[in-house]
Design a protein with these regions (language model features):
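NTP/phosphate- and nucleic-acid-binding module
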Residues: 1-473
């Protein structure tokens, strides 16, 4: 199935019907762009996180992990500029009172314009000059001036609400790493270069979230802050671009569905020396940002050092120098890359059986390391349940295993195909034999491959090693 034939509705319907993702708080009418990961979705998303941690922490000789608090000292966000300037440009339609993001209105009507490089005043002037930019709700060109809308969720700590109790839900996980730089370097005794990786929730009060789990107000980030000596940063910037792209390719994303887009100088954040986005060809847009890799220089550590009065310098024993490290940041949204894996894996195959009857097989070609279940155990008859459950219980010590003894074996195969289970293990009467008839058990099972639908017979004792070999990437 070509990428252009897929639609977001196909992905959403499969996720809702098979327990990957449900609308949040659905029995109360839901909450806009709030999604809950169901029984399959939580296993799938956990596997995405495990795959990232495996390559970025476990196998990397440079990186260590961290799990920082969601609610931080509010001075953190004053220092970084989030309190004063982490804002979206909002305007209202005077005719129908609908509220919109100005940059989105401009970008949708004039994709040739680099909106990221425009100031709020420049956006105001551009919209005023272009009457083809109209309200998507009522079609009128009559807007209020742009105003700032801060994206941080504000909360309060303690029993009273006043300015001294104000805190924020973190809009990014990166700052938890920066404020812990000295602690991590001291306790791990790491020398530069080294990185700190974190998986965690972040919150942004987006005015126009959408496209399923692509953009939500509550989301999970997988970020690495890689600290290096100034002057070596561009070399490491190139290293991490390749490393990130190879991780995606190793887990089944096709190279032709990825592109690396370097930010133009006008797009760059004022503290950034270079930024590249790895973009994916999502079915609902031409290209969508998947992964941002940025050279943040020493901006963050310098700001925190100045504001806190605590030294965040690194002493280089080889050169006898003190300096503030530069930072390369590969920042990936877990929910967004999970959606990309689902879009990539989704397929509808048109099949014809031996009688000439046509059928459509819906299948998720997920990499085995990402699939919610690594395998499913299917007894050919419920009479074989004891042996089948014995196999299931043994394999479940090592990975997630599904068990299904309801319906024809063909229908059970199709159910497992649709949820992405890479291997189905069929227990039949030859497996257990028949002592009364003098037929010895062969202690073998049939293993069916999801993608090829081919079947092989193998001893039960070889199942664990066989499946584990397929999970590697």
């Amino acid at each position: 199935m070509e990428q252009s034939e897929k639609t977001l509705d196909m992905i959403v319907n499969l996720c809702k019907n098979r327990g990957y993702v449900f609308p949040g708080s659905e029995i109360y009418g839901g909450l806009a762009n709030s999604w809950d990961y169901g029984p399959l979705g939580v296993e799938f998303k956990n596997n995405v996180k495990k795959a990232w941690l495996k390559k970025f922490v476990q196998e990397s000789p440079y990186n260590v992990g961290l799990d920082a608090a969601i609610i931080m000292n509010p001075q953190t966000w004053v220092t970084t500029g989030h309190v004063s300037s982490f804002s979206d440009p909002l305007l209202d339609c005077r005719a129908c009172k609908a509220r919109h993001r100005a940059d989105k209105l401009i970008g949708e009507e004039h994709p040739e314009v680099n909106v990221d490089a425009m100031s709020f005043d420049e956006m105001d002037a551009f919209i005023a000059e272009h009457e083809d930019i109209v309200c998507p709700v009522c079609g009128k060109h009559d807007f209020t001036p742009i105003r700032k809308f801060n994206l941080m969720f504000k909360t309060a700590i303690g029993v009273t609400e006043d300015s001294s109790s104000t805190c924020y839900l973190r809009p990014e996980t990166a700052q938890g790493i920066f404020v812990n730089f000295a602690n991590i370097q001291r306790t791990t005794r790491r020398k530069l270069p080294f990185g700190v990786c974190q998986v965690g929730k972040a919150f942004r009060n987006e005015i126009t979230p959408g496209n399923f789990t692509f953009r939500t107000r509550e989301f999970e980030q997988m970020e690495c802050e890689f600290f290096c000596k100034p002057g070596t940063d561009l070399e490491w910037f190139a290293y991490w671009k390749d490393y990130c792209e190879n991780w995606l390719l190793s887990l089944g994303i096709k190279k032709e569905h990825l592109r690396l887009r370097d930010h133009e100088p006008a797009e760059l954040a004022f503290y950034s020396r270079a930024t590249t986005d790895i973009e994916y060809a999502f079915p609902f847009t031409d290209w969508g940002e998947l992964w941002g890799i940025a050279d943040r220089t020493n901006y963050d550590l310098t700001r925190h050092q100045e504001a806190s009065g605590k030294s965040l310098e690194y002493f280089d024993s080889e050169t006898n120098e003190h300096y503030i490290p530069y930072v390369i940041e590969p920042s990936l949204g877990c929910d967004r890359v999970a959606l990309a894996f689902l879009c990539e894996a989704y397929d509808e195959e048109h099949l014809t059986d031996s009688k000439g009857k046509e059928d459509i097989r819906t299948v998720l070609h997920l990499h085995p390391a990402l699939a919610p279940y690594m395998c499913a155990v299917l007894p050919l008859s419920k009479k074989l349940g004891e042996k089948a459950m014995e196999i299931r219980n043994e394999l479940s010590k090592y990975f997630m295993v599904d068990y299904d003894d309801t319906g024809s074996i063909g229908k059970r195969y199709r159910r497992e195909d649709e949820i992405g289970t890479p291997y189905c293990i069929t227990v039949d009467f030859d497996t257990v034999g028949d002592e009364a008839k003098g037929i010895a058990a062969d202690n073998c099972v049939t293993v069916r491959d999801r993608d090829t639908m081919e079947q092989v017979r193998m001893p039960i004792s070889e199942l664990k090693a066989y499946i584990e070999s397929k999970i590697e990437f």
